């Protein structure tokens, strides 16, 4: 009898555990990882961009330390680079190669890790060339090079006289006389 009484309470308890187990994965599935949220933001950047080509995530700065509240907006900082894929191709940017000497943009803003919230607040600015961002070393005057000793001149070979071809002589022939027209007699009956 005692076993039959414990059985309904055990069934209820297992039912509650089953329901709780089903609810927990769905709640955690709604929260995006920091990287996934940034990739969605890059997707929206590509949709709203007026550029010819798509942008792809180049570098992602580390996430903020206070990642406790999954629904709150999180500050993000990342860089995107222009790809070879046209924006109208509808191809995922991750499948596109970076464009050689493509445009690089630094993006700063906030994203939400909640899948139900698609709002992103981003500000992207074009980066200057990497060489320009590095500090320049002070230029010191270069020491003057020591004069090099002149090499000894070697005797140059004598130039060979240039051969001029001799004209080909043909046997001489007297010129032919040019035929001249004979004068016609004037008729007398005139």
From Swiss-Prot:
Residues 133-151 have a biased composition (Basic residues). The modification Pyrrolidone carboxylic acid is found at residue 30. It holds the Pfam family Cathelicidins. InterPro entries: Cathelicidin-like, Cathelicidin_CS, Cystatin_sf. Keywords: Antibiotic, Antimicrobial, Disulfide bond, Pyrrolidone carboxylic acid, Repeat, Secreted, Signal. Residues 1-29 form the signal peptide. Residues 30-130 form a propeptide. GO terms for biological process: antimicrobial humoral immune response mediated by antimicrobial peptide; defense response to Gram-negative bacterium; defense response to Gram-positive bacterium; innate immune response. Disulfide bonds join 85-96, 107-124. SUPFAM superfamilies: Cystatin/monellin. One of its GO terms (molecular function) is lipopolysaccharide binding. Residues 133-190 are annotated as: Disordered. One of its GO terms (cellular component) is extracellular space. It is found in: Secreted. Exerts, in vitro, a potent antimicrobial activity. Probably due to an impairment of the function of the respiratory chain and of energy-dependent activities in the inner membrane of susceptible microorganisms. Belongs to the cathelicidin family. This is Cathelicidin-3. The lineage of its organism: Eukaryota, Metazoa, Chordata, Craniata, Vertebrata. The gene is CATHL3.
């Amino acid at each position: 009898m005692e076993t039959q009484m414990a059985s309904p309470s055990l069934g209820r308890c297992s039912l509650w555990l089953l329901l709780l187990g089903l609810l927990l994965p769905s709640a955690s599935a709604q929260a995006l990882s920091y990287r996934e949220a940034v990739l969605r933001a890059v997707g929206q950047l590509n949709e709203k961009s007026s550029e010819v080509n798509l942008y792809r995530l180049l570098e992602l700065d580390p996430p903020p330390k206070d990642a406790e509240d999954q629904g709150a907006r999180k500050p993000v900082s990342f860089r995107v680079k222009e790809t070879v894929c046209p924006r109208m191709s509808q191809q995922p940017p991750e499948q596109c190669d970076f464009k050689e000497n493509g445009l690089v943009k630094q993006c700063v803003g906030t994203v939400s890790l909640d899948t139900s919230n698609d709002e992103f607040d981003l500000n992207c600015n074009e980066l200057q060339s990497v060489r320009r961002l590095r500090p320049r070393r002070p230029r010191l005057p270069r020491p003057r090079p020591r004069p090099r000793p002149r090499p000894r001149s070697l005797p140059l070979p004598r130039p060979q006289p240039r051969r001029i071809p001799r004209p080909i002589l043909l046997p001489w022939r007297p010129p032919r006389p040019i035929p001249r027209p004979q004068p016609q007699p004037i008729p007398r009956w005139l």
